[in-house]
Amino acid sequence: MGGISIWQLLIIALIVVLLFGTKKLRSLGGDLGGAVKGFKNAMTSEEDKKALEDNAADKPAADAAKVTETAKVAETAPVAETAEKKAESKGKEQA
């Protein structure tokens, strides 16, 4: 009743083809397809850029965790005792 029937759509399509011609419609369709493809490429490149930024942001945190772990190991190692043992072993080698 209030909608557009299939026959009305066909008549509109026929009028558009008569007005613009098939060559112009073909080039318009190609241009529209190229624009959609460019838009999709831009969207995926933005997503890739965000993923790289997220990975770059996570990497310093991982490096900081490694440094903290190394610092904990260094704190627990008896440095003074190790230095004394090295001095004793050098004294034994010289003797």
Swiss-Prot record:
Q: Please give the residue ranges the record annotates as the region Disordered.
A: 50-95
The alphabetical list of record keywords is: Cell inner membrane, Cell membrane, Membrane, Protein transport, Translocation, Transmembrane, Transmembrane helix, Transport
GO MF entry, a single one: protein transmembrane transporter activity
Q: Which family does it belong to?
A: Belongs to the TatA/E family.
Where is the sequence biased in composition, kind Basic and acidic residues? Answer: 50-61, 82-95
Query: What parts of the sequence cross the membrane?
Result: 1-21
What is the protein named?
Sec-independent protein translocase protein TatA
Q: Which Pfam families match?
A: TatA_B_E
Q: Which GO terms describe its biological process?
A: protein transport by the Tat complex
Write down the species.
Answer: Shewanella halifaxensis (strain HAW-EB4)
Task: Write out the biased-composition intervals (Low complexity).
Answer: 62-81
InterPro entries hit by this protein: TatA/B/E (IPR003369), TatA/E (IPR006312)
**Topology with respect to the bilayer:** Single-pass membrane protein
Q: What is the lineage of its organism?
A: Bacteria, Pseudomonadati, Pseudomonadota, Gammaproteobacteria, Alteromonadales
Q: Which gene encodes it?
A: tatA
Q: Where in the cell is it found?
A: Cell inner membrane
One cellular component GO annotation, for this chain's record?
A: TAT protein transport complex
Top-level taxon in the UniProt lineage: Bacteria
**Protein's job:** Part of the twin-arginine translocation (Tat) system that transports large folded proteins containing a characteristic twin-arginine motif in their signal peptide across membranes. TatA could form the protein-conducting channel of the Tat system.
Q: How does it assemble?
A: The Tat system comprises two distinct complexes: a TatABC complex, containing multiple copies of TatA, TatB and TatC subunits, and a separate TatA complex, containing only TatA subunits. Substrates initially bind to the TatABC complex, which probably triggers association of the separate TatA complex to form the active translocon.
